[in-house]
Every structure is written in C-alpha cells, then in structure tokens.
Amino acid sequence: VYLTFKKQYDGTFLLAYASGRFPQDKVEVDKSYKSDWTKEQFDGLKEGDYSDPSNGTKLEDILKDHPKASNAEYSITTTRQGEFKKEMTISYSDYEAEDGKLKRVYLSFDTKEGDDTFYLTYKSGPDED
C-alpha cells in the first residue's frame, strides 16, 4: 500500500493519493501453467477504452476458457477525491508451448465507476514475440 498525504494550511494532513496491490480470488494462479491460448482466441478479444471500458471483453467470459494463469494481480488507485480505480492484470506464460498455442498473453482490465465487473482494456501477446 502506498499513501501520500498533503499538509493543509492549519497543519493537519489530508490523504492526497493512495494505491495498493492486493491478492485476488477471481483467477487461479498456476506457476506450472501450460498454454491453452490460440491466436484465434487472442484475436477475438475486444479491448474497451479507458474512458468506458465496458465495450471490452468481460474477464468472466475469458475465464470460462482460460481459468488458470501464470500470474494475476489486483490493484486499487485513487483517481479523484473519493473515487477509486480498480484494475486487474493477468499474464499467461508458457515458453515451451506446444505448436498452435501461444507462448505469452498479457491482459489488463478496468472497471467502470461504481461497478465491480472487469473489462479488457489492453492486450499483448503473439505479435510481440
């Protein structure tokens, strides 16, 4: 957890910024993950934009076909007074993947304000090898 306080004119301190990374329970992390991603599946993922992530593929839909990952991390950051941004990053890495399977997939998800549904906002993988 990272906190930043700003000193006020009367000598008191007010929270100016907060962020933290936390354990998550939506994705099963498997350090010996074996790739189950194809290029077609990766290409079928839709990225939402940061102002409205809800046009991106839902995390829950991806987890139906890919429930295990190499790594997953959940973070919360303040954006404005009283508002928090929730993000999830997931990586799938198998550098000895069998033919037809991807060696690496990295996905980043955001939520809409006041919503706990994660939507895909960024993906990278097969073209970056």
Language model features with spans:
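Residues within mature, well-folded domains
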Residues: 1-129
